[in-house]
């Protein structure tokens, strides 16, 4: 089989490192990045690409339109990219909006959102947890060892955080809704209690990490927290903390979104590349 031709567009540094990781699978063109190196072929203009791609890899999309953010504040539109794709091309990206999905699907392209893939979510837990640990070390005046840490939820990210903070010597507890999750946490050496009991427990924690994408910490709970408690919200927008109330109460809150790309862009890029490879293998491309 001939080597695949990839067109990687826009994004931050992890998109560049993803491009580098895809090199072993074929020839890789990069457009809209201010980074260069390795065997990745940089394109100053999209029209400089004189062959059509088998795979278009878009970054994590933030808007609701057809534009893709590039370095230097520039943008490229999906309508500019479709002419550079083979008819059988795969189009993949992160958090693809409905307009992009409909646009490429209408042209007959196979479309896949790598951000919805289970393997990417599992692998991203580690850099997310390490990012939370880094924030806790930078934003508090205490050691992680001996600190009292509360984690809300006990899904993949919460488990990774609990393992990491516990390994650093923190006294970790988790707030959960299901008794099965509480039992699992207790089996792993963690204190566990129900969300309904949060109000009574919250004053004793130095660091509180939220992983639940629903409102948890309202004004009442924020007010009950100790003065110097650090809140780290890892949940996707809109998060689980009343940020306006937190500001009014002078609470320390860090909304930590997209941590893998910020704290470990090389690893994050490799994870995306591995996920793209999985998609290609599954779809026989």
Model region roles, listed by residue range:
Residues 25-39, 168-188:
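NAD(P)-binding Rossmann-fold cofactor-contacting core
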Residues 42-49, 191-197:
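Short acidic-hydrophobic, aromatic-tinged amphipathic segments that line or gate anion-handling sites
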Residues 58-145, 275, 282:
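Glycine/serine-rich phosphate-binding loop and adjoining beta1-alpha1 elements at the start
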Residues 61-64, 77-86, 187-261:
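Rossmann-like adenosine-cofactor binding region
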Residues 2-5, 88, 145-148, 228:
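Phosphate-coordination loops involved in phosphoryl transfer and adenosine-cofactor binding
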Residues 12, 34-35, 97, 177-179, ...:
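Residues in the short beta-alpha loop(s) of Rossmann-like NAD(P)-binding domains
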Residues 6-16, 22, 145-165:
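Glycine-rich adenosine-cofactor-binding loop
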Residues 95-114, 234-281:
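Rossmann-fold NAD(P)-binding glycine/threonine-rich loop
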């Amino acid at each position: 089989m001939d080597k695949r031709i990839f067109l990687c567009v826009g994004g931050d540094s992890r998109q560049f490192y993803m491009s580098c990781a895809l090199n072993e699978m074929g020839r890789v063109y990069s457009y809209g990045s201010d980074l260069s190196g390795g065997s990745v072929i940089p394109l100053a203009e999209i029209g400089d690409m004189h062959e059509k791609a088998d795979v278009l890899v878009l970054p994590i999309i933030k808007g609701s339109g057809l534009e893709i953010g590039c370095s230097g504040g520039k943008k490229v539109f999906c309508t500019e990219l479709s002419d550079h794709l083979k008819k059988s091309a795969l189009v993949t990206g992160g958090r693809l909006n409905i307009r992009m999905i409909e646009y490429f699907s209408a042209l007959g392209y196979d479309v896949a959102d790598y951000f919805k893939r289970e393997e990417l979510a599992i692998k991203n837990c580690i850099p997310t947890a390490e990012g939370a640990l880094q924030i806790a070390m930078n934003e508090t005046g205490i050691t992680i060892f001996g600190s009292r840490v509360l984690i809300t939820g006990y899904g993949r990210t919460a488990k990774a955080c609990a393992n990491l903070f516990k390994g650093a010597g923190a006294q970790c507890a988790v707030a959960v809704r299901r008794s099965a999750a509480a039992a699992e946490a207790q089996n792993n050496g963690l204190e566990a209690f129900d969300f309904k009991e949060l109000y009574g427990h919250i004053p004793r924690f130095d660091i509180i990490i939220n992983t639940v994408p629903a409102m948890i910490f309202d004004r009442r709970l924020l007010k009950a927290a100790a003065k110097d408690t650090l809140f780290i919200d890892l949940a996707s927008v809109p998060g689980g903390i009343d940020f306006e109330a937190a500001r009014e109460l002078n609470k320390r809150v860090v909304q930590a979104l997209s941590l893998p790309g910020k704290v470990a862009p090389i690893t994050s890029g490799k994870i995306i590349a591995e996920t793209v490879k999985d998609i290609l293998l599954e779809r026989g491309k």
